[in-house]
UniProtKB/Swiss-Prot annotation:
Disruption phenotype: No effect on protein secretion by the type III secretion system (T3SS) encoded in the locus of effacement (LEE). This is UPF0597 protein YhaM. It comes from the Bacteria. It comes from Escherichia coli O157:H7. It holds the Pfam family SDH_alpha.
Length: 436
C-alpha cells in the first residue's frame, strides 16, 4: 500500500486522512441511520414491511431538519425508510447512491402508512448511536451503529446474533491512525506536508473534484438557502465586490447549499461530516486557483487543511454543541496560509485568530442554515490569513487564546468537550419542544 521507505508516522497520517476523508451522499447523521436500516434489510428474510429506529439525542438533533437526497423530504424517518427499501448495504456513507425512483416512492408510502418510527434511545450514553430494526411479519433484523457513522457494532435477527464487534484490540494489532494524532503537533503535520512524496497524497485531489462539482450545482440557485447563488447575484448587481474574498465565500457556501438542500451528488467529507469536508476543501481550492497552483501544490495545501481539521476535531466529541465547520475552517486557514507563504508562524497565527473569532458558534442541528455557518467560517478563515500575513493575530492575552497555538486548540476543545455539554442539552430540549 505504501512505499516501504515512507516514514511510518507519515503512513499513519495518510491512513488517518483516508479513514476520515470519504465520499458521503447526504447529511451523515441521517445517512448513518439509513445505513443501519439498509444492513438490517439485507439480513431480513423477505421484504421490509415495518421499520423501527432509535437514535442518540445528538443524532436526532442533526437529523430533524435536513433534506434526504432525492426525496425532497427532511428528517430521520424518510432516511430510515429509504435505507431499508432502497439502500446499498455495502456503500457506507453512500448508502443511498443507488436508490431508485420506485424505492423512494415505496419509502414515502411506508411513511404514509405509519409503518416507520424513530425515537430517542433512552438511556443513551453514546454521542453517536443509531439502531434500526426492520420487520417482515414476525421476522426481524436489527443493526446498531455506535461511535462512528459507519461503525456497525451489532447485527441480530430473530434467529440470533449475527455479528458483535469485539471491543478489545488484539495483541500486536496496530493502533488507530487517529490515536497517533493525539501525540502529534501542527509543526509535525506541516513537515509531513512539505516533504511527503506527491504520489503518496495525490488521492486528496479527489476532495477538490467532488466538492467543486457540488459547489457548481449549488450555484444553480435551486438548493437550500441558495446563499452562494444569492451572493453571486449581488456581485452582478454591484452590491458585493467580485474578488478573491467573495469567491471563497460564494463557492464554499454554494457547495453546502447543495449538500444540505438534498442534491444527489456526494460530498467529500471530513471527520464524518460533508460540511466539514466542504469547508476544509473549497476555500483552499479557490485560493489555489487564484495563484495558479499546480496539482502538487494544491494536493499539499489540501492535505494540510484536511489533516489539520482532523487533528483538531480528534480532540472533540464526534458530535457536540460546537459547530465543527469552524474547526474545519481552521484547517482551511492553514491550507490557504501555506499557499500564500508557507510559514508555520503564519499558519499558527491564522488558527489562533480563528479561535478568537468563531469559536462560540453553536451547532443547532443539521439544516439548510448550516450553509450560513459554513460561509461565515470560510470568511473568517481568509480574514485570519490576511491578518497573519500582516503579522497580526489574536494574542495569548485575550480570551481562550493562548500564547501557543497547540494550547489554544486544547482550550477550545476543552470548552466543547465539557462546558458546552449543557449547551448541547439545552439545544436538544429546544428543538424537541419544536418537534412536538
Amino acid at each position: 500500500m505504501f512505499d516501504s521507505t515512507l516514514n511510518p508516522l507519515w503512513q499513519r497520517y495518510i491512513l488517518a486522512v483516508q479513514e476520515e476523508v470519504k465520499p458521503a451522499l447526504g447529511c451523515t447523521e441521517p445517512i448513518s441511520l439509513a445505513l443501519a436500516a439498509a444492513v438490517a434489510a439485507a439480513e431480513l428474510e423477505g421484504p421490509v414491511e415495518r421499520v423501527e429506529a432509535w437514535v442518540s439525542p445528538n443524532l436526532m438533533k442533526n437529523g430533524l431538519g435536513v433534506t434526504v437526497p432525492g426525496t425532497g423530504m427532511v428528517g430521520l424517518p424518510i432516511a430510515a425508510a429509504l435505507g431499508a427499501l432502497g439502500g446499498n448495504a455495502n456503500a457506507g456513507l453512500e448508502v443511498l447512491k443507488d436508490a431508485t425512483a420506485q424505492a423512494i416512492a415505496d419509502a414515502k408510502a411506508l411513511l404514509a402508512a405509519g409503518k416507520v418510527s424513530v425515537k430517542i434511545q433512552e438511556p443513551c450514553n453514546e454521542i453517536l448511536f443509531s439502531r434500526a430494526k426492520v420487520w417482515n411479519g414476525e421476522k426481524w433484523a436489527c443493526v446498531t451503529i455506535v461511535g462512528g457513522h459507519t461503525n456497525i457494532v451489532h447485527i441480530e435477527t430473530h434467529d440470533g446474533v449475527v455479528f458483535t464487534q469485539q471491543a478489545c484490540v488484539a495483541e500486536g494489532e496496530q493502533e488507530s491512525p487517529l490515536s497517533v494524532l493525539s501525540r502529534t503537533t501542527l509543526a509535525e503535520i506541516l513537515k509531513f506536508v512539505n516533504e511527503v512524496p506527491f504520489a503518496a497524497i495525490r488521492f486528496i485531489l479527489d476532495s477538490a473534484k467532488l466538492n467543486c462539482a457540488l459547489s457548481q450545482e449549488g450555484l444553480s440557485g435551486k438548493w437550500g438557502l441558495h446563499i452562494g447563488a444569492t451572493l453571486e447575484k449581488q456581485c452582478e448587481r454591484g452590491l458585493l465586490a467580485k474578488d478573491l474574498s467573495s469567491s471563497i465565500v460564494i463557492r464554499t457556501s454554494a457547495a453546502s447549499d447543495a449538500r444540505m438542500g438534498g442534491a444527489t451528488l456526494p460530498a467529500m467529507s471530513n471527520s464524518g461530516s460533508g460540511n466539514q469536508g466542504i469547508t476544509a476543501t473549497m476555500p483552499v481550492v479557490v485560493v489555489a486557483e487564484h495563484f495558479g497552483a499546480d496539482d502538487e501544490r494544491l494536493a499539499r495545501a489540501l492535505m494540510l487543511s484536511h489533516l489539520s481539521a482532523i487533528y483538531i476535531h480528534n480532540q472533540l466529541p464526534r458530535l457536540s454543541a460546537l459547530c465543527a465547520a469552524t474547526t474545519a475552517a481552521m484547517g482551511a486557514a492553514a491550507g490557504m496560509a501555506w499557499l500564500v507563504d508557507g510559514r508555520y508562524e503564519t499558519i499558527s497565527m491564522a488558527i489562533s485568530s480563528m479561535i478568537g473569532d468563531v469559536s462560540g458558534m453553536i451547532c443547532d442541528g443539521a439544516s439548510n442554515s448550516c450553509a450560513m455557518k459554513v460561509s461565515t467560517s470560510a470568511s473568517a478563515a481568509w480574514k485570519a490569513v490576511l491578518m497573519a500575513l500582516d503579522d497580526t493575530a489574536v494574542t495569548g492575552n485575550e480570551g481562550i487564546v493562548a500564547h501557543d497555538v497547540e494550547q489554544s486548540i486544547a482550550n477550545l476543545c476543552a470548552l466543547a468537550s465539557h462546558s458546552m455539554q449543557q449547551t448541547d442539552r439545552q439545544i436538544i430540549e429546544i428543538m424537541a419542544s419544536k418537534a412536538r
